[in-house]
């Protein structure tokens, strides 16, 4: 306290002593003269008119942003000379959605605790004000790792090639119960349908992390991200690799069709990539040999397969080849001759002029084909022969479609041989000749008798020479 060091008494023996101070509290004032003194206490009080925020200190920081755990500050209110002011109402504000009592009242020491809660992680500015005096401090709320959950799982890259290298990607975001992002959190990851993924990933400062997923299997893969008891799943799609398209299978599904140019043998071609994933919409080149007819290209369906239809007018084996890129497979199909159109294609005399002895045979060869000239084996051909000749009534064709017809006769001359199948017929003539080996005088007849015996007029006779079966023999010398 401040006062004049001496005072002089007035006529009545008294004098006023004036004491001032800038320090609130009790001040002891002592008056002395000679060896006599007395003391009294005087009190100075803080000046509420100059109340101000003297300090604002953070006492508790980095509390969890759960709306319950509080960061705390201590505000001190003094007058202009630093004297603590009790019972002063301090206005308080907090930003970024934090919660705080709008006013607090100072304790006897001029201070008061301010509690701030928030559900939003981050920095909060707290401002304490009285009169026109204010101070601000920042406090930090942190996300609550105890309530970590999968907030989002979003596909950021889809439809990657199923080559085991190209990746589909997803972004997972981890937050606490109030949506505050959580960095450094370990997220467990699984992927279905044979896809490959890291078993765990760690979130970045923004609470997110990329998840790359690869696969060698085309189709849908369910990717699941989990933390604590929280999980989310999203589907990603892998597509077959058209760059590695190949012929995986070529299978005969129908064989032994008739070679009539319309009934088809069929094959099924399957196109996959290197890892066996079926490829739809792929153009496969097709060839067929031995005169068969096939569309030059076919296009695979959704299951990666396509039907190949092959027709032919030529019986036999046809090699069918399917190709894509540098991949090729071939399969044989068989066309068979059409027995419904069996016909006598040829009837050829291969031995003629046999002796009419009932044993020596003239020979013919019949050839049976279908309408397109394909040889028909195992076909029954009906045979007839004229002029008394003898032949088997039916013959059966060999694998080459031909059969030999043997004809014998005891009657010399021409015999017409006819071969018939269905409504088709051909005829050829063969000749049998009399057997000179068995020449004989068949008859000797007098044709002129009783002629005059004048050495000129003649009696005549006719001799007839035949073989053993009575066939006349010309050019025979008769003694």
Regions found by a protein language model. Give the residues of each.
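Thr-biased low-complexity repeat/linker tracts and other Thr-enriched repetitive architectures
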Residues: 1-479
């Amino acid at each position: 306290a401040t006062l004049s060091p001496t005072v002089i008494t007035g006529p009545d023996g008294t004098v006023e002593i004036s004491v001032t101070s800038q320090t609130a509290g009790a001040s002891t004032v002592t008056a002395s003269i000679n060896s006599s003194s007395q003391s009294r206490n005087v009190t100075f009080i803080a000046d509420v008119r100059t109340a101000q925020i003297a300090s604002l200190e953070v006492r508790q920081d980095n509390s969890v942003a759960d709306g319950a755990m509080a960061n705390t500050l201590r505000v001190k209110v003094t007058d202009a000379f630093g004297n603590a002011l009790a019972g002063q109402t301090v206005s308080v504000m907090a930003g970024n959605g934090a919660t705080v009592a709008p006013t607090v009242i100072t304790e006897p020491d001029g201070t008061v605790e301010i509690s701030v809660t928030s559900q939003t992680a981050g920095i909060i500015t707290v401002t304490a004000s009285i009169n026109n005096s204010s101070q601000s401090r920042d406090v930090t709320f942190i996300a609550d790792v105890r309530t970590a959950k999968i907030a989002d799982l979003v596909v950021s890259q889809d439809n990657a090639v199923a080559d085991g290298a190209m990746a589909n990607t997803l972004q997972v975001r981890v937050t606490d119960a109030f949506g505050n992002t959580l960095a450094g959190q370990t997220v467990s990851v699984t992927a279905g349908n044979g896809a490959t993924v890291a078993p765990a990933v760690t979130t970045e400062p923004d609470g997110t992390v990329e998840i790359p997923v690869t696969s060698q299997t085309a189709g849908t893969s369910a990717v699941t991200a989990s933390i604590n008891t929280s999980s989310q799943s999203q589907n990603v799609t892998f597509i077959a690799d058209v760059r590695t398209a190949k012929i995986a299978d070529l299978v005969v599904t129908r064989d032994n069709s008739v070679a009539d140019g319309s009934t088809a043998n069929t094959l099924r071609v399957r196109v996959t990539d290197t890892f066996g994933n079926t490829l739809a919409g792929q153009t496969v080149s097709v060839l067929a040999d031995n005169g068969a007819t096939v569309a030059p290209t076919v296009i695979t369906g959704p299951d990666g397969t396509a039907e190949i239809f092959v027709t032919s007018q030529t019986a036999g084996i046809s090699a069918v080849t399917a190709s894509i890129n540098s991949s090729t497979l071939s399969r044989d199909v068989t066309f068979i001759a059409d027995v419904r159109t069996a016909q006598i294609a040829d009837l050829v005399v291969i031995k003629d002029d046999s002796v009419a002895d009932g044993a020596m045979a003239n020979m013919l060869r019949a050839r049976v084909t279908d309408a397109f000239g394909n040889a028909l084996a195992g076909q029954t051909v009906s045979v007839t022969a004229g002029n008394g000749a003898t032949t088997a009534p039916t013959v059966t064709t060999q694998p080459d479609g031909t059969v030999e017809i043997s004809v014998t006769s005891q009657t010399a001359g021409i015999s017409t041989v006819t071969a018939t199948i269905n409504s088709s017929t051909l005829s050829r003539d063969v000749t049998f000749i009399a057997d000179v080996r068995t020449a004989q005088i068949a008859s000797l007849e007098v044709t002129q008798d009783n002629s005059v015996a004048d050495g000129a007029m003649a009696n005549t006779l006719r001799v007839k020479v035949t073989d053993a079966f009575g066939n006349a023999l010309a050019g025979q010398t008769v003694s």
